[in-house]
Amino acid sequence: MINKKSTIVVTGAAGFIGSCMAGYLNEQGFENLILVDEFDEDEKELNLHEKKYAVRIERENFFDWLDIEKPDIKFVFHLGARTDTTEFDYAIHQHLNVDYSQKIWNYCTKHNIPLVYASSAATYGSGELGYADDHEIIERLQPLNPYGISKNEFDKWALQQESKPPFWAGLKFFNVYGPNEYHKARMASMIFHGYHQIKKDGFVKLFKSHKKDFNDGEQLRDFIYLKDVIKMCYWFMENWQQATGNWKQAISNGIYNIGTGKARSFKDL
């Protein structure tokens, strides 16, 4: 059973989503956190300001540290990834988004630790197969960039595994915006960039449409506020144990969309 003294791992803990996950866990009374990331950027360091945790570990040292320290981990939020959609060196995505995630999965499986990991709506590509979080379409999805491909490759791998954690969920985040994305530069959300453009210039530049069915600025996206994403992640941790009992609303292992379910245009924003 998870209680307020339980040890919880958050990867990507200095980043956009991970730092807010750590902060929300603190708000709920969890302070025995193991934070994993690359802690080499001053702006990311600001994301950890006043966060309470037991220890923080450099990403590439994490598994060696686990072998030595053998902590009694009760839950893992694997939120770290290379999220740059303009990074076209697939080897980087393979290492960070596939291989590293497989090591997290295997560790959780071996030590009987429930796992929530970040997938992405980028796996849906141009949406030609729709956006349903149906496991049957995952093999046929056609992501548009190496980031989306790597996320989909791990999703496919996870679904194929016979050995698995006691509970696992891959969460396909849609277009997330909110606090602590200042360090992301060009990869910050459209809402972040739009806000600062309006403050500076009095207007916002919208993306040109490359589809004849949509005029410029009328492209549709599902924008979801970061704190809503965090609450959903936490909900899985709170409720996964019901999945092993006879509760009539038991949570199944698998891959889930995390969005509002409603698309909005850039002009509307």
Model features per residue range: what roles?
Residues 59-96:
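NAD(P)H-binding glycine-rich loop region in Rossmannoid oxidoreductase-like domains
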